[in-house]
Amino acid sequence: MSRHYEVVFLVHPDQSEQVPAMIERYKSLIEGGNGTIHRLEDWGRRQLAYPIQNLVKAHYVLLNIEVDQAVLSELVESFRFNDAVLRHLVIKRDGPDTEQSLIMKSKDEKGDKPERSERRRRDDEEGDAAPAATDTDGDNAEAA
């Protein structure tokens, strides 16, 4: 007996380039078990509400699917044994959700303004480079 589920999983940000392959693997698992995918959204890298494994960002993917329990169990087990998947959430739904999610609607309305994406990229680069330690005089601590 097939039921409707909403599945969200978070992927390690260093593995973002492998997300399309992961999605294809999960799609083939669902469709191979006579399941249906009603909605598939790749939300991209987003800020986490709290750090997970000392990470502040993760790659989000949303699926609305209709599968039976055996396929769902196999899908959840594949999430659990994949080290790149940081977290996953499965919610039982009453029916299929095919319309665009609120996150994707707001993303389309805002658009990704070039100056905003440039600022995000610059902030990411600055966050990766550790600033040099300074003493109270403003000189480098190593020079003292």
UniProtKB/Swiss-Prot annotation:
GO molecular function terms noted in the UniProt entry: small ribosomal subunit rRNA binding; structural constituent of ribosome
GO cellular component annotations of the record: cytosolic small ribosomal subunit
Where are the annotated segments for Disordered? 97-144
Q: Where is the composition biased (Basic and acidic residues)?
A: 105-124
Extract the InterPro entries matched here. Ribosomal_bS6 (IPR000529), Ribosomal_bS6_sf (IPR035980), Ribosomal_S6_plastid/chlpt (IPR020814), Transl_elong_EF1B/ribsomal_bS6 (IPR014717)
- Quick check: keyword tRNA processing in the entry? no
Spell out the protein name for this chain: Small ribosomal subunit protein bS6
Q: Which organism was this protein described from? A: Xanthomonas campestris pv. campestris (strain ATCC 33913 / DSM 3586 / NCPPB 528 / LMG 568 / P 25)
Checking NCBIfam families in the record gives:
S6
Record-level GO BP terms? translation
Q: Which family does it belong to?
A: Belongs to the bacterial ribosomal protein bS6 family.
- Return the Pfam families for the record: Ribosomal_S6
Print the keywords alphabetically.
Ribonucleoprotein, Ribosomal protein, RNA-binding, rRNA-binding
Superkingdom is Bacteria
- Function comment: Binds together with bS18 to 16S ribosomal RNA.
